[in-house]
Design a protein with these regions (language model features):
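Membrane-embedded alpha-helical bundles that constitute the cytochrome b-like, heme-associated redox core
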Residues: 1-218
Length: 218
């Protein structure tokens, strides 16, 4: 990673491509998922059959793309941003939460500014870990099961296995949708609401040296 003219190169090309494909795929999954959930709803004039086909194709693309994320985080320096540090975790999370709830509106500086060593603040970091390593795999596994229902256990305590799988799939999809909304909002927080969106396009994040605190830990 290189730093130049108060810009930090945080998003390598592979990560930007992955992010773009993932964002488009997730949005399509949400739209088509809503159409499938509410069969009487005419969303974007999309008929049910088209929604099923688009949902399945988008799911396959997001699944294959997920392996790009996993492999990338195994073989590139990007993995360091997802390392869990239990010591002081609660204190860091509470500090960031207080900033979002109060400090942000008082014009206070962010307690965990972006640097070469820290891409995410504590709340972002653990939210991303939950989403990318728990919610997304659950959505993928339940989605595959629904594509091949013969793989699903017939009943669990007299309740249809297909129903339970669909319920879990829909619930995880809802949580990912909520995360996406929060993610977009948080991305707009900063000196300029478009800064973070530019960063994911060109790879560089604008950083102000005075905001850096080398004593802060991730």
């Amino acid at each position: 990673m290189t730093s130049e003219n108060n810009k930090i190169y945080l998003y390598p090309l592979w990560l930007r491509i992955w992010h773009g494909v993932n964002a488009l795929g997730i949005i399509l999954l949400i739209i088509t998922g809503i159409r499938l959930q509410y069969s009487d709803l005419r969303l974007l004039s999309m008929d049910f059959g088209t929604a099923v086909q688009m949902h399945n194709i988008s799911g396959v693309v997001v699944t294959l793309n997920y392996f790009v994320f996993i492999i990338g985080n195994l073989v590139t320096p990007n993995k360091k941003y997802y390392r869990i540090k239990p010591k002081g975790l609660v204190k860091r999370v509470r500090k960031q939460a207080n900033y979002y709830l109060s400090g942000l509106f008082k014009g206070e500086e962010a307690p965990f500014p972006i640097s070469e060593k820290r891409k995410f603040n504590p709340l972002q970091k653990y939210a991303y870990i939950f989403v990318m390593y728990i919610f997304v795999p659950l959505a993928i596994l339940t989605g595959i099961a629904l594509l091949f229902p013969e793989l699903i256990i017939e009943e669990v305590y007299a309740v249809s296995g297909v129903f339970l799988t669909a319920l879990l799939h829909g619930s995880v999809g809802f949580l990912i949708s909520v995360f996406l909304i929060i993610h977009l909002y948080v991305a707009s927080i900063g000196k300029n609401p478009l800064d973070n969106f530019r960063s994911i396009v060109n790879g560089y994040h604008d950083v102000h040296p005075k905001e850096e605190d080398p004593k802060e830990k991730k």
